[in-house]
């Protein structure tokens, strides 16, 4: 039987209604998914995520830089969007709200940009020529998006150019050097935001001086081998943007 992901998602909703709202403990997810050609829950989950992400009507906007203020109108309007920046003309340090050493960033020529949330990490340094991606997408009421959905796609793409590519938590390493960091965050009950910083500029000394030494060695992608525009275009393909 040919798989029908749209039907499968509708059938999962019927299953959840029966199990949760009607308190029917005999409800079996496979009885529902089999009607749409699925007998493997992992395959269904992967296809469902792909469908939810790629069936949205995104706008693509090039920005001089990326920060929470530029993305906010799309987030508040619940309008799916891919914002990106390559040629920003300045150096930026993206920091959690609690970061309090703006003078150190300024000393090395970086303009501080608050991320709008807190985490345990220090500044994320970004230079003219790096690729910054900010995706706004609508959440589904019961289908969760894997935190590493885009990491896995990017890793597989990079393996076309490099033999040694790994995912390490929220980072991607090439030849054991960190070239990329990315996160998926809940903005509201209805909106997810995906943020990526992909390094094409050598910032090794600045990262060591500002962030201190880390177990992960800072690295970057050689733009003679692979440029930022090409990776940006891959994100557009992954979102099925025409």
Over which residues does each language-model region extend?
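Beta-rich nucleic-acid/ligand-interaction surfaces
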Residues: 166-185
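DPxDG-like acidic metal-binding loop motif
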Residues: 125-139, 191
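Active-site loop/lid in soluble adenylation, ligation, and acyl-transfer enzymes
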Residues: 2-18, 25, 45, 49-125, ...
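RNase H-like, Mg2+-dependent phosphodiesterase core
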Residues: 40
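Surface-exposed interaction regions that form or flank ligand-binding interfaces
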Residues: 53, 59-61, 71, 175-179, ...
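Long, positively charged amphipathic alpha-helical accessory segments at protein N-termini or as interdomain linkers
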Residues: 5-7, 14-19, 50, 138-166, ...
